[in-house]
Regions:
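A short, charged, and often flexible helix/loop element on the N-terminal side
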Residues: 47-92, 107
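Alpha-helix capping/helix-boundary segments
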Residues: 34, 112-113, 163-165
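Histidine-centered beta-alpha loop that forms part of the nucleotide-sugar donor binding/catalytic region
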Residues: 7-8, 110, 132-136, 183-184
């Protein structure tokens, strides 16, 4: 299964590594700021010249690497942070999906990137998964309309504990079936995610 995980959260690496261990082809779209964190880790970063589709090479400035079996795509920090430039990032993800179709788009914080990912997945008719965090909860107050819209578009939402599940169900128009409790430290993380993605893919027309 080819998958795309999108975000700067520290949990993204853990999820991506677990999915690679299951034999999946995992692309991780992040900002160049993520490189600082990864450079401090034990695993090496190797520059990759063979993972980016030709159609994506000039849409946004991007650096590509191999990292723990993950195909890492780091977008220029300015394009990542500024919503005014997110139309280019939208185009990038659309072209990427056309060249290398992914079964699922799974996104994390920050909120503008999470919203962009869900919007793009909706446009592409690809299942979208959102891992909720306390960072995202502030959007409920700041952008309540977009918060509710995102909740109605996601195929599944992931939280780390039953307590967080209960909290999210009070904050967003989601059903208990949509909100999955997945502890990112569990030993069978890759298998759990694979089962979820497979189910979502089967439910997509």
């Amino acid at each position: 299964m080819r998958l795309c995980v999108i975000g700067d959260s520290l949990d993204v690496r853990r999820y991506a590594v677990a999915l690679v261990a299951q034999g999946h082809q995992v692309y991780w779209l992040a900002s160049t700021e993520t490189l600082r964190t990864l450079h401090n880790g034990a695993a090496p970063l190797t520059v990759a010249t063979d993972i980016l589709p030709a159609t994506c090479q000039y849409v946004v400035p991007v650096q590509t690497y191999h990292y723990e079996g993950i195909r890492l795509m780091c977008v220029d920090q300015e394009c990542w942070q500024h919503p005014d430039l997110h139309t280019r990032l939208f185009t990038y993800v659309c072209l990427f999906q056309r060249a290398l179709p992914c079964a699922v788009l799974h996104t994390w914080s920050p909120w503008p990137i999470a919203y962009l990912t869900i919007y793009t997945a909706r446009f592409l008719a690809v299942p979208a998964v959102l891992s909720y965090s306390s960072q995202l909860a502030s959007a409920k107050l700041e952008q309540p309309f977009l918060w509710d819209w995102v909740a109605r578009q996601v195929a599944a939402a992931i939280v780390p504990s039953p307590a967080e599940q209960e909290r999210l169900l009070t904050l967003a128009p989601l059903s208990a079936r949509q909100v999955q409790v997945i502890d990112p430290t569990q030993p069978h993380l890759g298998q759990t995610l694979t089962a979820l993605y497979t189910r979502l893919g089967a439910a997509t027309p």
